[in-house]
Amino acid sequence: MKEREKVVRLAKLAEQAERYDDMVEFMKTLARMDVDMSAEERLLFSVGFKKTIGARRASWRILESLEQKVTAGDQPGVTINGYKKKVEDELRAVCNEVLSIIAIHCLPLANSGENVVFFYKMKGDYYRYLAEFSTGTEKKAATDQSLMAYQAWPCAQLFSLLEIMNSPERASQVAKQALDEATAEINSAGVEGYKDSMLMMQLLKENLALWTSELTGGETSKDDDVVMEG
């Protein structure tokens, strides 16, 4: 059995056993083989990290809620804050590791438009997770990076469809859907400072509509508004 196949099989086994930390380690090994991941492999990569980060995000939200219920400076509040910072350190470590792997091993090796789209979306998600608990300049940097990734993956999907299908109309529809999904992700995140990002998303959508109009002879979708919440 080839090493790549063995690692994938072990990752599947770890998933079945709900040992997600092990699953992540196996998929990190695969990513560092510098291969263009198959659909199955990239899903395993994503699921492993999503399970790992998901549990910690849930813990952070619980601690954040508990901290808000105590008086500032009280001993219980100090204890909660210290424990919350420990969880934040774990979140930061996981996010930074995912982003590093995507930047070094995943995007450079992605030969298909589908893979490029997948990893840009994942990149945007993990910068957004960083922004959820960060403050100050760290929060702004994570927010900006998340926006850049979310801007990139709808465009990557559009160009991929144009290349494969030679269908500007269909490509525009799928790219619009991708952009709408990214907008929904940002709206639901409730992260302070994302309103500026939403304005930039609106500009991106307008540019996409204009470009598509040129390709299709002037016909554009009328449903081009981004709904901003919160």
Swiss-Prot record:
One of its GO terms (cellular component) is cytoplasm. It comes from the Eukaryota. Transmembrane segments: none annotated. GO terms for biological process: protein localization; signal transduction. Belongs to the 14-3-3 family. Is associated with a DNA binding complex that binds to the G box, a well-characterized cis-acting DNA regulatory element found in plant genes. This is Putative 14-3-3-like protein GF14-H. It comes from Oryza sativa subsp. japonica (Rice). The lineage of its organism: Eukaryota, Viridiplantae, Streptophyta, Embryophyta, Tracheophyta.
